[in-house]
Amino acid sequence: MGIDFLFILKALIIAIVEGLTEFVPVSSTGHMILVGDLIHFNTQSGGFPEMYEVVIQLGAILAVVVLYWRKISSSVVEFLSYIFSFIGLKTSGDKRKYEKRLAESETGFRFGINVIIGTIPAAILGLLFHDEIKEYLFSTKTVAIGFIVGGILLIVIENNFRKRAKRSKIVKDIDKMTYGQSLLVGCFQCLSLWPGMSRSASTIMGGWISGLSTTVATEFTFFLAIPAMVGASGLDLFKFDYSQMNATNWISLILGFIVAFIVSLVVIDKFINYLKKKPMRVFAIYRVFAGIVLAILIFTKVIS
C-alpha cells in the first residue's frame, strides 16, 4: 500500500492547530475535534486519529520543557536534594550540614509539591472516568457548549479578578504560591476534561480566583501540563493497537510531533508577552463566537 500524502497533509493541519491552541485559553482538543471533522481526518478506523492527537500533544509539551528547562531542571534537583537532606537530617549526626541544604533547596521542593498537588484532582478524575469521558464528551456538540460556557466564565472571572487586584495582594512570583492555591488551580483543571473548556483557561481561572497574577497562573498552567498530559497520553498510548500502523501513519506521527513542537515554541513565547500587556477578553469573545457558529453548523447539519 502506497503513502497517502493527502492524509499526511490533513495530519499536519491538525498538528498546526494543536500547536496554535494548546497553551492559549481556547481548547486545543475542541479545535482538533472540530477541524478534524471538517477535513474528515477523524474518519479513519482503528483509533489512529485519537492516538495521533495524543502524540502531537506530547510535542507541544516538549516545547514547555525546552523553554522552561532551567526552572524545571533546577526544581527537580532541589526537590530531590530536599528529600535526601531531610533523610540525612533524621539519620545523621551532622545536622548543621543538612539544615543548610534543606534551606537552600526549599524553594524547589515547594514548587515540586505545588505541581504534584495541582496534578492530583484531574489525575484522579481522569483515571476514574477515562472511558466515559472519551465516549460521552468527545463530540462537536459538547465542544460547542464548552466553547460558550468557557468564554463566558473567562469574561466574568477575569473582570472580578481585575477589580479584586486593585484592592488586594496578588501573588506575582510562582515560587510564592501556597499549597492551597495549587490545590484550587488543580480542582479547576478538572474542567479541562470536558473538550471545549480548555485546560489553560480552566487553570488560569483557578489561578485568578486563588489570587495569582495572570502571568503566574499561566506559567503554572504550563508546568501542570507536563505531568497531566504525559499521564493522560501514556494511558492512551498504552491502550493503542500498533499492529494496524502503516507507513502513512508513522510518517504522519513523526512529522506531526515535530510541527506541533515548533509551533508551540513560538506560541508560548508570544502568548506570555501578550498577557503582560493585554487582557484575555479577546480569547473569551472568540470562544463564544466560535461556539455559536459551531452550534449553527451542527443544527444545520453542515457538520455532525
Swiss-Prot record:
The chain crosses the membrane at residues 5-25, 47-67, 72-92, 111-131, 137-157, 209-231, 248-268, 283-303. GO terms for molecular function: undecaprenyl-diphosphatase activity. Keywords: Antibiotic resistance, Cell membrane, Cell shape, Cell wall biogenesis/degradation, Hydrolase, Membrane, Peptidoglycan synthesis, Transmembrane, Transmembrane helix. The keyword Lipid biosynthesis does not apply. The keyword Transmembrane helix applies. Pfam families: BacA. Its EC number is 3.6.1.27. It is an enzyme of class 3 (hydrolase). It is found in: Cell membrane. One of its GO terms (cellular component) is plasma membrane. Signal peptide: none annotated. InterPro entries: UppP. Its main location: membrane. It catalyses: di-trans,octa-cis-undecaprenyl diphosphate + H2O = di-trans,octa-cis-undecaprenyl phosphate + phosphate + H(+). GO terms for biological process: cell wall organization; peptidoglycan biosynthetic process; regulation of cell shape; response to antibiotic. It is a multi-pass membrane protein. Belongs to the UppP family. PANTHER family: UNDECAPRENYL-DIPHOSPHATASE. Catalyzes the dephosphorylation of undecaprenyl diphosphate (UPP). Confers resistance to bacitracin. Bacitracin is thought to be involved in the inhibition of peptidoglycan synthesis by sequestering undecaprenyl diphosphate, thereby reducing the pool of lipid carrier available. This is Undecaprenyl-diphosphatase. It comes from Clostridium perfringens (strain 13 / Type A).
